[in-house]
Regions:
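Intrinsic disorder/low-complexity segments
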Residues: 1-3
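C-terminal catalytic "cap/lid" subdomain
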Residues: 7-232
């Protein structure tokens, strides 16, 4: 018996990984990044079952901002944002020539790598990623954003912001607050996602997805620059 192959099959079956890929990372102006992250997903999928949930980013915000001129229904506007996440997901999935699932249940049944966007109004793509991780009993959840992890305040606005290498889920929930309700809002991780991560005790990493080496390190369980969310 080839023990190396047996071990590899074991890894693929047990170390399912969900990645929440922030919409800020996916842009029509940065096709090289999209190709590079797709190649990383392709490579890592040989060793792990990968599920990638893509955010709406600038595209979602632009459409939601425009639609606010005609509508102030947050649930309706959120549907527009979901369509933007799916456009971004389709763009990434085009590398694999794959369709994207529209529900967590569909995603769980699809052959990996799975690429998807948002699902239902009121849930950010981070929340969708957390729900998917819980549904498939993923080994870990990686939140790839455009900052180096979780800070005590917004590092884009405060030069003295301090990054947490590790933070408890309880402290994180206190920092974030209880609600995420306005369509198009952008936060590192929202309250609904936090609640799911806390309840399901999902091993969660937050890092800068622009640095693909750090993302690869996190996928493969190596040391990375970011924040570990402690749920115990």
């Amino acid at each position: 018996m080839d023990t190396k192959n047996v071990y590899k099959i074991f890894l693929i079956q047990t170390m399912k990984t969900v990645i929440s890929l922030g919409g800020s990372l996916i842009s029509l102006d940065n096709l090289d990044y999209i190709r590079n992250v797709a190649e990383l997903i392709e490579k890592a999928s040989q060793d792990f079952d990968l599920y990638v949930v893509v955010g709406g980013g600038k595209l979602a915000r632009q459409y939601i901002k425009a639609a606010r001129h005609f509508c102030n229904d947050e649930r309706y506007l959120d549907k527009l944002g979901i369509l933007a996440t799916r456009l971004n997901a389709f763009l990434l999935a085009s590398f694999f020539k794959k369709d994207i699932p529209e529900t967590i249940e569909e995603a769980a049944k699809q052959e990996t790598p799975v690429i998807m966007g948002g699902t239902t109004p009121g849930h950010s793509t981070d929340a969708v990623a957390a729900m998917l991780a819980k549904h498939i009993n993923a080994y870990r959840l990686i939140i790839a954003t455009d900052v180096d992890g979780i800070y005590d305040k917004d590092p884009k606005k405060h030069a003295d912001a301090k990054k947490y290498d590790e933070i408890s889920i309880e402290k994180l929930k206190e920092m974030i607050g209880k609600e995420w309700s306005r369509a198009g809002e952008s936060v590192v991780i929202d309250a609904i996602a936090c609640k799911i991560i806390s309840k399901a005790k999902i091993k969660t990493f937050v890092l800068n997805g622009k640095n693909l080496q750090q993302l690869e390190n996190a996928i493969y369980g190596k040391q990375f620059n970011g924040t570990v969310i402690v749920t115990k």
